[in-house]
Amino acid sequence: MRKEAIHHRSTDNFAYAYDSETLHLRLQTKKNDVDHVELLFGDPYEWHDGAWQFQTMPMRKTGSDGLFDYWLAEVKPPYRRLRYGFVLRAGGEKLVYTEKGFYHEAPSDDTAYYFCFPFLHRVDLFQAPDWVKDTVWYQIFPERFANGNPAISPKGARPWGSEDPTPTSFFGGDLQGIIDHLDYLADLGITGIYLTPIFRAPSNHKYDTADYFEIDPHFGDKETLKTLVKRCHEKGIRVMLDAVFNHCGYEFGPFQDVLKNGAASRYKDWFHIREFPLQTEPRPNYDTFAFVPQMPKLNTAHPEVKRYLLDVATYWIREFDIDGWRLDVANEIDHQFWREFRQAVKALKPDVYILGEIWHDAMPWLRGDQFDAVMNYPLADAALRFFAKEDMSASEFADRLMHVLHSYPKQVNEAAFNLLGSHDTPRLLTVCGGDVRKVKLLFLFQLTFTGSPCIYYGDEIGMTGGNDPECRKCMVWDPEKQNKELYEHVKQLIALRKQYRALRRGDVAFLAADDEVNHLVYAKTDGNETVMIIINRSNEAAEIPMPIDARGKWLVNLLTGERFAAEAETLCVSLPPYGFVLYAVESW
């Protein structure tokens, strides 16, 4: 066995409390190197005749990526504390892996050899809102969704959909427009909407906030927002707003005071200013988002800034009953601020959803004291490469997803925000080269995978567009210009996700990933409920074997309702190019 590939640490994604009674312990080994792993464990204070008392239990392999196998044990220590190690076997070889290294037999004279989970404290649990696991999100860019009140449209706003957008163009989308189309969202099956910023700002995107306590007048007023939230809640739809706390806009009052009064401004320490007077060329002499001078970075460690922003966060929850905050550029704000942010909003509404925008490994923010989830860009990247661009093989795709899933605790994955497109990325149909079949596969994967899926407005009807601003076109409301077949496909998948708990909350296992014909088979299992997803990501028809012994089972085609008994040991499924099928597996 390759010792250098065997790895565990007693924290984060390798050792964590899944709930108030259960510990999840993971082990990493070289791919295809180890035959069998057992967890060796016991209470650190259980001794008899000078020997530590321990027991063993088998660990199960939960997946593999390109380099490693991952093993899991779920244990409920009766006294909520544990010392533990691992017994690995390959062929005739046996190793006992402990915190102090490798042994041929398990030491019993001192528990200090072993890994330690000192105590399972309920207060330390990572606890995301349970409702998020069942939510299907819909992201709305308010300026481009619908114009429900032309009287408040910006001066010079273009007729709806009359031309392609520019970085500075306006079309008059507003909150009333969203209210007017809630029935559309409810019909699709949406149970959560995520609004990009709605606070007063000069731009069309509103990420340059001028006043965090006011709705932008071109979007509506506070009464309109209250109506929107109330109507959404009546339809079982949650509402999440976008918080831009990393930076403000150029017109933000305190920054304007600094521009006016320079070093004498009482707000000068609200920002990261290197010297006075402020300059923007060749680059700003104050910290900004990227190098954008119109977006000065806020000093969130400053007590007044912290108090101001925490007041913002709690105000919109307390007064408008919103259900979540999406946090822009969350990784560039200090961890202490986010800890206090969580305490403040959770004290007000314990099941509020805290979602961070982080594009890289986000484990430091997902330990239970800051965020409930992050936007799952690694999943989106892998899905777009495999299904749309076709520059990733089936096995590479499965490996990538297993790596993502094993990078975080299970409950983190269950609450992950699984997007495929957004206001920052090209439209799905555009990335797919206009091939609707590929878009269907993307939605199939997204709506059957672990996590909380989010659809970007218009992707469900086949809207097109490249990078910003092309991906921010006006929503198409003319039925003749909507792809109704794609809409019905998405609607059916959402309905199946609601019907089958395994699709929402089940464990995922990749059963086959064939690189020759690029087919993929994975299963979602929750208790006795199993759904198999079989995909042909190829431009040729394929006969795909089901990689399970299905004898004695009923197979129900979830797309057609066809139900048949599996009598043969192996079954093959015939799929057209870019075809797919979902089977519920039921016992006779």
From Swiss-Prot:
One of its GO terms (biological process) is pullulan catabolic process. Keywords: Carbohydrate metabolism, Glycosidase, Hydrolase. Substrate binds at residues 247, 326, 423-424, 468, 472. Hydrolyzes alpha-, beta- and gamma-cyclodextrins with the highest activity with alpha-cyclodextrin (cyclomaltohexaose). Pullulan is the preferred substrate from linear substrates. Maltose is a major product of these reactions. Is also able to hydrolyze maltotriose and acarbose, and transglycosylate their hydrolytic products. Major reaction products of maltotriose and of acarbose are maltose and glucose, and glucose and pseudotrisaccharide, respectively. No activity with glucose or maltose as substrate. SUPFAM superfamilies: (Trans)glycosidases (SSF51445), Glycosyl hydrolase domain (SSF51011). GO terms for molecular function: cyclomaltodextrinase activity; identical protein binding; protein homodimerization activity. No metal dependence, but Mn(2+) increases the activity with alpha-cyclodextrin as substrate. No effect on the activity with presence or absence of Ca(2+), Zn(2+), Tween-20 or EDTA. Pfam families: Alpha-amylase, Alpha-amylase_N, Malt_amylase_C. The active site is at residues 328, 357. The lineage of its organism: Bacteria, Bacillati, Bacillota, Bacilli, Bacillales. Optimum temperature is 55 degrees Celsius for hydrolysis of alpha-cyclodextrin. Thermostable. No significant loss of catalytic activity even after overnight incubation at 65 degrees. EDTA enhances the thermostability, the half-life being 90 minutes at 70 degrees Celsius in the absence of EDTA, increasing to 360 minutes in the presence of 10 mM EDTA. However, overnight incubation at 4 degrees Celsius is first required for enhancement of thermostability. Activity decreases drastically at 75 degrees Celsius. InterPro entries: Glyco_hydro_13_cat_dom (IPR006047), Glyco_hydro_13_lg-like_dom (IPR004185), Glyco_hydro_b (IPR013780), Glycoside_hydrolase_SF (IPR017853), Ig-like_fold (IPR013783), Malt_amylase-like_C (IPR032091), O16G_dom_2 (IPR045857). This is Cyclomaltodextrinase. Belongs to the glycosyl hydrolase 13 family. The record marks 424 as: Transition state stabilizer. It is an enzyme of class 3 (hydrolase). It catalyses: cyclomaltodextrin + H2O = linear maltodextrin. Its EC number is 3.2.1.54. Optimum pH is 6.0 for hydrolysis of alpha-cyclodextrin. Exists as a monomer or a homodimer in solution. Homodimer is more active and stable than the monomer. It comes from the Bacteria. PANTHER family: ALPHA-AMYLASE FAMILY MEMBER (PTHR10357), MALTODEXTRIN GLUCOSIDASE (PTHR10357:SF210). Gene3D superfamilies: Glycosidases, Golgi alpha-mannosidase II, Immunoglobulins, Oligo-1,6-glucosidase, Domain 2.
